[in-house]
């Protein structure tokens, strides 16, 4: 399983360039976990694929002020759908390993827990199969290709429409974002 790695963002980049670097690192993390997630032999591959998608979706939200509205509208939906397709497999894995397993240790031989384990394993197998299907569908391949190409074609909205965000340095853009987030938690 491949965990998130540095996106290579540096202070000389514009906010849009930083978004591209982050988005490409997310796509690469997703692709590096794809074969393992499809095989279904280690649930960590699905987990790391979901981490990549979650990071990408967060980047889309954070960098929205410097992205074209149509770009966000189109791709946010597709990444959400893919995340949902993988979610059930991860949820069942977590339930079986982190919730049910401690109960089985506390109550060894409990017949109800054995039934729950058997049903949970069945659900996990079905969910893993659905995740594998999602990653082998043509629509997934098309999403990767279209999104990667669109990353290099996306243009920021007009400066007036975005409140000058694309004209900011990455440092000032980040400071503005952090300021907004800080106000949300006050």
State where each predicted segment sits.
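Cationic, histidine-enriched alpha-helical/coil surfaces that engage anionic ligands
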Residues: 1-186
């Amino acid at each position: 399983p491949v965990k998130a790695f540095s996106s290579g963002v540096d202070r000389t980049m514009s906010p849009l360039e930083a978004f591209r670097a982050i988005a490409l690192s997310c796509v690469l993390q997703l692709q590096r976990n794809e074969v393992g997630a499809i095989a279904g032999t280690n649930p960590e591959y699905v987990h790391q694929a979901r981490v990549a998608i979650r990071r990408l979706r967060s980047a889309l939200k954070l960098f929205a002020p410097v992205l074209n509205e149509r770009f966000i509208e189109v791709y946010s939906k597709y990444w959400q759908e893919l995340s949902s397709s993988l979610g059930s497999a991860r949820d069942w894995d977590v339930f079986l390993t982190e919730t049910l397993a401690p109960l089985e240790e506390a109550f060894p031989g409990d017949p109800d827990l054995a039934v729950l384990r058997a049903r949970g394993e069945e659900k996990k197998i079905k969910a893993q199969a659905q995740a594998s299907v999602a990653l082998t569908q043509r629509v997934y391949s098309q999403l990767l290709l279209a999104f990667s190409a669109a990353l290099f074609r996306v243009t920021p909205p007009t400066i007036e429409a975005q409140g000058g965000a694309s004209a900011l340095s990455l440092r000032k853009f980040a400071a503005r974002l952090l300021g907004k987030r800080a106000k949300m938690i006050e």
